[in-house]
């Protein structure tokens, strides 16, 4: 069947790849392609964050975890590696359910905690170097015959294909008239210094992370709802550095080499469902919040299940 995918971020590319693997003809429609999508500036580590409903996103996240783990073993050129990470908390809580399905999970000993953190855990997680991962997926799509159409769509009726996979992200505000879609602004810092392991405080109000990739370490972050600014803010930079130094006292500010800003496509819950419109089957797949990469393969497989059942 001829299928259209709207959106060329990681969600759209992953859905396109799954469609091609099943023998469908695929065209991706987008007004932005890599390296100009928000996915290209993702930190990016596998970690469920700012995405709902929890039960579904946990399942999609673990399915993605498994796929990324296999990619790290079989395709090192993809930029996916497995690193240890540590989550630090100021309160003792029950670990999330997803921790039961990942490798290397353990509760930290008291002597492994830093500063005034009182609880935490260690785990193994895929770290994705997006400036390698996005071209890697794109190359696979090209080799499989995917077509690309750079266009600014206003209406679904502009698409000829009868099957549409809608991965438009923030663009759903206009294309779908979905006012529940809101940006969550994220600013990060790039530094040439390796902390050895990833360190996180993923509570939304104190969002802090140091993510060691093969090329740089990414420091973050911010989670500013309904903030559309793409400017680098000095006050955010200072706040990020102060927070990261509490997790990583050895951080050396002299090693900073750059900054970036992206707008996460947030929604009260991921919209992954079918809709019929003008005799077209539309499968919506957007609103992944801060977990676009983390949910990508699980959501793509869910899209395929919906398509195959129709």
Task: Label each region the model flagged.
Residues 63-144, 267, 274:
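Flavin (FAD/FMN) cofactor-binding and adjacent substrate-gating region
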Residues 136, 254-310:
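C-terminal catalytic lobe of FAD-dependent flavoproteins
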Residues 1-9:
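Beta1/beta-strand and adjacent pyrophosphate-binding region of the FAD-binding site
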Residues 43-63:
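N-terminal glycine-rich dinucleotide-binding loop that anchors FAD/FMN and/or NAD(P) in oxidoreductases
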Residues 12-13:
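N-terminal Rossmann-fold NAD(P) dinucleotide-binding loop
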Residues 70-71, 181, 196-197, 214-218, ...:
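Flavin-binding catalytic cores
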Residues 124-206, 215, 225-228, 235-243:
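Predominantly flavin-linked oxidoreductase catalytic cores and closely associated redox partners
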Residues 21-40:
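Glycine-rich FAD pyrophosphate-binding loop
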